[in-house]
């Protein structure tokens, strides 16, 4: 009869921790991927907005050049340019925030990967111990069988 491994419950806990660490690593990788996509989208939006802003400023200057314009209109023009600059700063701040989120997610992913590696190593240690224990248990069972066989030898006929 095969004996039950005495550390079986510890082994199952280690496997559970290993699986949980793998799931946490997958979640961290997914969050990192999403953060990188968001960063790329914000960077693209900023680049496109800057291109549009240059065209818009040029269009606004063309509308003013060669005409007599009241001072109020020039003030409104300058105010409009300031608003465009403020919008650019908002987009640049959003991009920087997205980059910070990517760095944070990279750190989380690195920690999750390290935790998963540690969990795998811990489970492997118990697996190795179980393998050694099974070999020892098998040898002990064979030794017990040999002892029983020696005790059971038939008496000699003389």
Residue ranges and their predicted role:
Residues 1-158:
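Charge-rich amphipathic alpha-helical interaction elements
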């Amino acid at each position: 009869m095969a004996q039950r491994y005495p550390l079986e419950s510890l082994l199952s806990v280690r496997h559970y921790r290993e699986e949980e660490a793998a799931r946490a690593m997958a979640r961290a990788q997914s969050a990192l991927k999403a953060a990188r996509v968001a960063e790329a989208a914000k960077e693209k939006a900023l680049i496109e907005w800057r291109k549009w802003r240059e065209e818009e400023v040029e269009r606004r200057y063309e509308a003013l050049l060669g005409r007599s314009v009241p001072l109020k209109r020039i003030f409104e023009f300058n105010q409009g340019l300031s608003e465009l600059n403020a919008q650019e700063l908002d987009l640049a701040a959003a991009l920087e925030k997205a980059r910070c989120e990517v760095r944070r997610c990279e750190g989380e992913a690195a920690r999750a990967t390290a935790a998963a590696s540690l969990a795998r190593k811990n489970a492997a240690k118990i697996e190795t111990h179980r393998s050694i224990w099974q070999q020892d248990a098998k040898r002990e069972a064979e030794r017990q069988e040999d002892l029983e066989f020696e005790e059971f030898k038939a008496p000699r006929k003389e």
